[in-house]
């Protein structure tokens, strides 16, 4: 009793009690050998006495019967004995075969292969916490490598590569919209060099959700590497539309998986876990490998009242945390914002208030094309107020069409009208949902603001709601659009004025909840600029993750994970690839520099015709200016440049220089020096020499 009271406050008091009892028995019966508790029949302890369970009764009157009964009891547990956890032992080979068969099943539906959801029992059997801790040392002999091809130090272009042994898999393949410095560029996608170099090792790509920064680059990737694609139903539906536009749908392998399903990719087992975001069917990924389990959250938030009723699967994330998580890769977009992210339903309430405020006026609402929940709420409020709804923007029309066809959005009969039909209805009976919430040039709202839209002209009485927050870097473009709308007399409402937008990304408290329930050994912040990543790393420290277990990576870095350490092990190609029209990758930094120079300082073309035999100048040189100076107002400067060109060509002929490249370089250098001296500007100089 004294020893019991001494150890009763310890967390493992049962272990100490059993130890003391065994010591007591050893003293009492010196001739008995102490057998480990797990190898002998479980003993029932009662008031200091040891009694034998009923299944091994002894006959005290017969030594022979006692011996025989003990032998039977010893044989009996081989087929039906329970282990120390109270679970019936199974044949390991049989269990392995059953699990293998379960993982290999698939259902053919609508021409796609959908992996069948593994039973949670199988997951528990494979994830026993004691067994896992014992096996972890063996598993982690093989390191897990994670290469970041995009998504770090930027918002967009998300792409991650996992490598373990001879197997690789990808997560997401997004795009990034160009900034104002990228003249003439339509899209920016990741560099696929490392993927194409290791194409034979890539087992597949898993997509977390259907936003452009996660699926926008997929069509360009699949043109170079034909690998299977996995995603939830809506995500695959949106991908199908993109691949159809690129004309490669038939040659691609698209596979639908649901939250809870397991996808086997080489040595990787990928489980999809439902999360909340601003688009339905978003998932986090639990990626199991011989090295351990890594959770990549994707874009997420914790919404307790989501529009579709599907809350984040906290229970499964907690269970994985109990089983053991090697690393957590967490969304960092809102890591600098305290508190919790508002529920999407909050926007619906604001819409109803603002729509009523706009009584008698035409409503124009700009939002992300893929924000199906937002579109649904706009339609619901419009229906309640007796307004018709028109869609403007090709991407918006495509997404709504796909979502309606798949049952993710409800459109009442007769409420949706074509954009060509808006003039048939009174202004106070219309709501126009449009793209362009980020101020993108050539988007529908942009064209409306600058009077370039073929069907919609902004009127002084219009009520415009911009239901989005500018992505970092887009603030100037959004401000430009707002200014133009105001100049035309429209009233503009945006997020800073009213709650017309809530984020789809977790704020600080939600991020800390994710860390607390998953209990990762290592933490890598992803999806954000440097300031977001560092803030998220600070949150990880605040919940108790050791600083040495937190790593802030960068695009092009390869991170190696083992049970003992996390480190940056190397570099991989991970630059920007610019898409300009149908050209992919043919626009580089040099081309962008030239375009910027042309835009800022203009162009000077020098044209001269020279006799091929004698080297005499037959005509010219002519000096032509475009975008540099107005010729009529700068005749003296142009004339000075012409005389300088004459002198340079004459010197070259005198020196018998017949290498026209050398002549062009001299012309370029001399004229460039003159122009900078006279104007402090550096136009592009383009010499053209023709031989006759």
Model-predicted regions and their roles:
Residues 656-692:
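C-terminal tails and terminal domains of large nucleic-acid-associated
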